[in-house]
Amino acid sequence: MAIAKEDILAAVEGMTVLELNELVKAFEEKFGVSAAAVAVAGPAGGGAAAAAEEKTDFTVVLAEAGSNKVAVIKAVREITGLGLKEAKDLVDGAPKPVKEGVDKAAAEEAKKKLEDAGAKVELK
């Protein structure tokens, strides 16, 4: 019996970020592909038009953990759903992205939680 797309999506939905990363690496090895985004050249002379568009996807970057690292680790776990070890490794490895490709409201919310915990955060 074939696995339905819904079953696959349900399984992926229940995975942690670390498990998803391992899954992507397995796909890359199995099928000989790369998950890197392909850069598409923009239209020539479109600088003014691009500036007029508002950015919709944001990356929340933990620039520095600050003095209260425990609170920052708790905030990272709350935002990402990572386990304790993964969250600690992320905080220890700062600067690192905490969330990628999120909308402005979610990025601002994550930034506020991290800053309230004592971290220095950048939105890109």
From Swiss-Prot:
One GO MF term: structural constituent of ribosome
GO cellular component terms attached to this protein's record: cytosolic large ribosomal subunit
Any one Pfam family match given in the protein's UniProt record, by short name: Ribosomal_L12_N
Alphabetical list of SUPFAM superfamilies matching this protein: ClpS-like, Ribosomal protein L7/12, oligomerisation (N-terminal) domain
Keyword terms of this UniProt record: Ribonucleoprotein, Ribosomal protein
Keyword Ribonucleoprotein: yes
InterPro entries attached to this UniProt entry: Ribosomal_bL12, Ribosomal_bL12_C, Ribosomal_bL12_C/ClpS-like, Ribosomal_bL12_oligo, Ribosomal_bL12_oligo_N_sf
GO biological process assignments: translation
Top-level lineage group: Bacteria
UniProt similarity note: Belongs to the bacterial ribosomal protein bL12 family.
Its job: Forms part of the ribosomal stalk which helps the ribosome interact with GTP-bound translation factors. Is thus essential for accurate translation.
Subunit field text: Homodimer. Part of the ribosomal stalk of the 50S ribosomal subunit. Forms a multimeric L10(L12)X complex, where L10 forms an elongated spine to which 2 to 4 L12 dimers bind in a sequential fashion. Binds GTP-bound translation factors.
NCBIfam families the record matches: L12
Protein name: Large ribosomal subunit protein bL12
Species this chain originates from: Burkholderia multivorans (strain ATCC 17616 / 249)
